[in-house]
A protein has these predicted regions:
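Small-residue-enriched hydrophobic alpha-helices in membranes
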Residues: 1-14, 24-188, 194-227
């Protein structure tokens, strides 16, 4: 667990450095990630040290990824969580720089994910970023009284993003949507990830991810009238 934890922040530092200089915003983003994990004292210092190590020009990315695979016993769910953590950190400013994308492809390869699998996860994360910034499903209830046409456009955009979060096409039937939802929830269930060795500090991030999947599914069900 400690190996996984340190590697996660070191690789985050490496991704942040991909654009050249690590900006103040990226350091704030790393701090925000530490806040999401409720890291304080010694744990926070360990995360900060790891992030700094990742910024070194001679950071041994491939070696670190090999250690991550060993520490997780190659468990798909944990490796996916690790990759998605890097994607969400890279997306925290709203977009992905080409050099960040290149590093993410290296990370994906090192964890035995194909380029196609990475690109799909990038699309899912981009949709999730927009979905959350617009308030997700729960924001829908609050905006219904203001501006009907804006609301329709906003809901159409959110619905499109909800389908992307579940990685299904917008004409998918209720069975297909439910199957995709169950698969993603099974892979991202916080308790299952913990049982497989996810560091407890990362439980909050896992909960946020599963809530995101739940919100996307709830919106599709509501708009499409799926049971």
């Amino acid at each position: 667990q400690e190996e996984f934890f340190k590697a996660a922040f070191a690789v985050m530092g490496h991704v942040a450095k991909a654009k050249g200089q690590v900006t103040k915003e990226e350091i704030q983003l790393a701090s925000a990630m530490m806040d999401r994990m409720n890291l304080h004292g010694e744990q926070r210092r360990a995360a900060q040290d790891a992030f700094r190590e990742g910024k070194d020009s001679d950071f041994p990315l491939e070696d670190v990824l090999v250690r991550v695979k060993i520490s997780t016993a190659g468990r798909f769910d944990l490796l996916q969580f690790f990759l998605e953590l890097q994607i969400s950190a890279a997306f925290a400013d709203g977009s992905i720089h080409p050099s960040e994308r290149n590093v993410l492809h290296k990370i994906a390869r090192g964890l035995d994910f194909s380029s196609e699998q990475l690109e799909r996860r990038l699309q899912m994360q981009e949709a999730a970023f927009r979905f959350q910034s617009q308030g997700g499903f729960h924001g829908q209830h609050q905006g219904q009284s203001s501006g009907g046409s804006w609301q329709q456009a906003s809901q159409a955009d959110q619905l499109a993003d909800a389908y992307k979060i579940l990685d299904v096409s917008s004409d998918a039937d209720s069975k297909t949507v439910k199957r995709a939802y169950r698969k993603l929830m099974n892979e991202h269930h916080p308790d299952k990830l913990m049982a497989k060795g996810l560091p407890p500090e990362m439980m909050n991030v896992a909960k946020e991810k599963s809530q995101e999947i739940q919100n996307a599914y709830d919106l599709i069900k509501k708009v499409k009238g799926f049971k």
